[in-house]
A protein has these predicted regions:
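Conserved AMP-binding/adenylation subdomain of ANL enzymes
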Residues: 290-308, 318-358, 373
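AMP-dependent adenylate-forming
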Residues: 26-30, 88-116, 230
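Conserved AMP-binding/adenylate-forming
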Residues: 299, 387-514, 521-524, 537
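Conserved pre-ATP/AMP-binding loop-to-beta segment of ANL
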Residues: 101, 224, 237-271, 278, ...
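AMP-binding/adenylate-forming catalytic core of the ANL superfamily
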Residues: 144, 169-195, 353, 473, ...
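Structural core segment of the AMP-binding/adenylate-forming
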Residues: 158-244, 347, 355, 363-364
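Conserved AMP-binding/adenylate-forming core of the ANL superfamily
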Residues: 37-41, 88, 103-157, 174-179, ...
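Adenylate-forming
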Residues: 189-208, 229, 337-341, 357-403, ...
Length: 651
């Protein structure tokens, strides 16, 4: 197989990954010839590897005498058990001058805001003082109901600076979704923006904020700001708590205070999607998340100081945490809040050109949407600084690789990356010193013993199986919130294979040492006892111009499972019988006869999580007349109605 892109030798030699390969080779008197050998060293010599990159990345903190305690235990291993570090300190206290740009924030109204490093530090200082006056201490929880703007970053860094725990939900969460999350984690302080705008529609969040503050007895203080509509609110004065306006930057900044927390001290609570019950509250540490995210930025993305790093995300998705960690590399992070198509397909690309982004991160769904429009970057849009496009959220189709290189930019590193909320980082991602192969994630992340297991727990190559990690790594969660004996934590990741992290993705390792993800394990189809990943079907179906997107489930029928394919058609397109035949032929030609759906049904929309992922399990439940456990976790629960009592499915 030929690569679709290869790095130039000059680029390889100047990369941080190449620098690390040479450093580890030199310091350990060995010769690591390529990325595969560097990766093998990183998982076979964990203590040396994590100590080396701590120093090489310039992290501020104390390592302690031991780099890894109980390496044979999973869970149970501890990285830097004597170490002390603070996530926020590493993002704020370095040699970036006060007049440099730390944050550029955009929203769909066209508003552009810049925060210098000095303004960011002064703003965090003011917010830190407000939290202290509210009685916030280490290990208290601060909850953000916030859009992706500077206020969210300021509040999070101030929270982390005190050793308190930051947890956030985006404005697309309704009251029940917020209570399902904050009701478990019991924040002491709520930080909230009163309005947002999405797809040109203003949304007033005041009533939701009042409701959650009334319901959450743990909340003693509400810190609020106007949001996009710039209207000051007075309704909060009636709440049985202290209501404060978001503070202005400090004019007489003293030296910022940072709690030197243990490496394993909790920093973030992130939430699972909650589509199978109440969301899991996943606890991540200062040290584990910081060292993992900075590693990904500096080596896997080759991010440098002063470069512009963008990822399209909300504060309810782990990619927001991933993005703000870019400050620790002294990069400028770019925020965008609103619809990525508010001004058409060019919306984000125009900002990319104006702001000189180096890294453009987005979702596979977004790239697919551009591809469906056959949009291409205009000739006058040179995008001179852009050198990497990152995609995540779902598998990036093989055809989307072609689209990026043919229609968006031909000389970029296209990194399909994958991990999850569970590890607030990636298992597989880009590698600037390796070639890109169509449809593949370039490789496993440094320090991560990623493998594919068959049903018996044996490693397999070029064969589909369970994505696992066989050795501990720093970004493993501390555990779940309110799970003192870690029973739920162990059940979630370590029951399938003893002492091995099972991630829940159905994947394979390729001959090029890359990876292909075929879908979620719990959504795998099983007709006639043969396991089929849904992504294999979606890839074929979404090549049809008439079809916007697809979702496949296995329907139990006559003591077997039949594959049912649901498609959303483009406007003014119909699912004709001849189109169904074409779909079946293409799937059969490019996969196997087992992949061919027994039924193909047109629906108006597919249900999605709040982070935009389609939910096969919820559809499967509706089709089998089973209850959907947590509709509040869906962005559009009304879409489930389209799957009820479909005549074809009753036959």
């Amino acid at each position: 197989m030929n690569p679709i892109w290869s790095p130039k030798q000059e680029f390889v030699l100047q990369s941080r990954m190449e620098h690390l390969r040479q450093r580890i080779s030199s310091e350990n008197s060995i010769i690591l010839k390529n990325y595969s050998e560097l990766h093998r060293f990183s998982i076979e010599n964990q203590e040396i590897f994590w100590r080396t990159i701590w120093e090489d990345m310039g992290l501020q903190g104390v390592q302690g005498e031991v780099a890894l305690e109980n390496p044979q235990l999973m869970p149970g291993a501890k990285f830097f058990p004597e170490g002390r570090i603070n996530f926020a300190k590493n993002c704020l206290i370095h040699d970036q001058a006060d007049d440099g740009i730390a944050i550029i924030a955009h929203d769909e109204t066209g508003l552009r805001r810049e925060l210098s490093w000095g303004e960011l530090r002064a703003s965090v200082d003011s917010f830190q003082k407000m939290l202290l006056e509210a009685g916030v201490q280490a290990s208290d929880v601060v909850g953000g109901y916030v859009a992706n703007g500077p206020e969210a970053v300021i509040a999070a860094l101030a929270t982390l600076s005190l050793g308190a725990i930051w947890t956030s939900c985006s404005p697309d969460f309704g009251v029940q979704g917020l209570l399902d999350r904050f009701g478990q984690t019991k924040p002491k302080v709520i930080v909230a923006g009163c309005s947002v705008r999405y797809n040109k529609k203003p949304i007033d969040l005041t009533e939701r904020i009042i409701q959650i503050c009334e319901e959450l007895l743990s909340v003693t203080h509400l810190i609020h700001f106007p949001g996009t509509e710039a209207v000051e609110r007075t309704e909060f004065s009636k709440l049985p708590l202290t209501s404060l306006q978001f503070p202005k930057p400090s004019s007489s900044r003293n030296e910022l205070f940072f709690e030197e927390t243990p490496f394993q001290h909790p920093a973030f609570i992130l939430y699972s999607s909650g589509t199978t019950g109440k969301p899991k509250c996943i606890l991540h540490s200062h040290g584990g998340s910081l060292i993992q995210l900075v590693k990904e930025h500096q080596y896997h993305v080759d991010l440098r100081a002063n470069e512009r790093l963008f990822f399209y995300t909300t504060c309810g998705w782990m990619m927001w945490n991933w993005l703000i960690a870019g400050l620790a590399t002294k990069a400028t992070i770019v925020l965008y809040d609103g619809s990525p198509f508010s001004r058409g397909a060019k919306t984000l690309w125009k900002i990319c050109e104006q702001d000189d982004w180096s890294i453009f991160g987005t979702s596979a769904k977004y790239i697919s949407a551009l591809e469906k429009q056959n949009w291409q970057t205009p000739q006058e849009m040179e995008l001179l600084k852009l050198r990497a496009i990152l995609s995540t959220g779902s598998p990036l189709a093989h055809e989307s690789f072609d689209y990026v290189y043919h229609k968006l930019k031909n000389n970029v590193l296209l990194g399909s990356i994958s991990g999850g909320t569970d590890i607030v980082s990636c298992f597989m991602l880009s590698c600037p010193i390796r070639a890109v192969y169509r449809g593949q994630l370039q490789g496993a992340g440094l320090g991560l013993a990623v493998d594919i297991f068959d049903e018996e727990g044996k490693p397999v190559q070029e064969q589909k199986g369970e994505l696992v990690c066989t050795k501990p790594f720093p970004a493993m969660p501390i555990g779940f919130w309110d799970d003192p004996d870690q029973k739920r934590y162990r059940s979630a990741y370590f029951e399938r294979f003893d002492g091995v992290w099972t991630h829940g993705d159905y994947a394979e390792r390729t001959a090029q040492d890359g990876f292909v993800i075929h879908g979620r394990s719990d959504a795998v189809l099983n007709p006639g006892g043969v396991r089929i990943g849904t992504a294999e079907i979606y890839r074929q179906v979404e090549t049809f111009e008439e079809i916007l997107e697809a979702l496949a489930i296995g329907q139990e029928k006559n003591n077997d499972v039949r594959v049912v394919l649901f498609v959303v058609m483009k406007e003014q397109q119909e699912l004709r019988d001849d189109l169904k035949d074409q779909i079946r032929r293409r799937i059969k030609q490019n996969t196997t006869p087992r992949h061919v759906p027994d039924l193909i049904v047109s629906v108006a929309a597919l249900p999605r999580t709040l982070s935009g992922k389609i939910v096969e399990l919820a559809v499967r439940a509706v089709v089998h007349n089973l209850p959907v456990k947590n509709k509040e976790a869906l962005a559009n629960p009304e879409a489930l109605e389209y799957f009820k009592d479909i005549p074809e499915l009753q036959k």
